[in-house]
């Protein structure tokens, strides 16, 4: 695809890591094989500069970001400081539960919070959106949307209160 020619993607799906572990996880995802904690950040920076010089952007996506410790969030903030004279070398994208907002409101994370340029919260899905969401997930899984009746899909939506993560969990167990 087209996005791969413009972006180097780093994906951390389950970031229950301290600051140093996070540095090494990012390095591994970037293809950096080094276990020297004193060199790892400079090796990451060198890699990011090389990627930037080719015209590509590096994007670090962290899922379940509410699980990040304050130390790991500070490590991410420092990654966000890596830049050339004109450009940031890495974009950070955090996905998390509402607890992430609570964590980011902590006083010691104010510097991190000040660097957030865009924030978005998802509202619960309407019943029609919930049914369409379930249909889409089933289609993507190759199961077709006929596994559950419309009444069952609405019951799943109701039990999940329209929250996509809960819809996924309930559907998976059903």
Regions found by a protein language model. Give the residues of each.
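Alpha-helical scaffold elements adjacent to nucleotide-binding pockets in ATP/GTP-utilizing enzyme cores
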Residues: 2, 21-29, 43, 71, ...
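Conserved NTP-binding/hydrolysis module of P-loop NTPases
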Residues: 4-9, 17-35
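Helix-loop-helix "sensor" segment of P-loop NTPases
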Residues: 32, 51-55, 82-84, 93, ...
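Conserved Rossmann-like nucleotide-binding pocket used by diverse enzymes
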Residues: 61, 96, 121
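A short beta-strand-to-loop transition that corresponds to the Sensor-1 phosphate-sensing loop
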Residues: 64, 94-99
């Amino acid at each position: 695809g087209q996005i791969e020619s413009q972006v180097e993607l780093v994906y951390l799906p389950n970031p229950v890591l301290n600051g140093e572990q996070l540095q090494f996880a990012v390095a591994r995802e970037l293809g950096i094989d080094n276990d020297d904690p004193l060199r790892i950040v400079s090796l990451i920076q060198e890699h990011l500069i090389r990627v930037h010089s080719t015209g590509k952007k590096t994007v670090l996506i962290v899922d379940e970001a509410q699980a990040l410790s304050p130390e790991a969030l500070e490590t991410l903030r420092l990654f966000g400081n890596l830049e050339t004279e004109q450009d940031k070398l890495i974009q950070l994208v955090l996905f998390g539960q509402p607890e992430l907002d609570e964590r980011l409101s902590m006083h010691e994370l104010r510097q991190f919070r000040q660097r957030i340029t865009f924030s978005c919260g998802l509202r619960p899905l309407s019943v029609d959106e919930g049914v369409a969401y379930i249909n889409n997930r089933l289609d993507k899984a190759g199961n077709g949307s006929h596994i559950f009746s419309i009444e069952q899909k609405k019951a799943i939506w109701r039990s999940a209160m329209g929250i996509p993560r809960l819809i996924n969990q309930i559907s998976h167990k059903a």
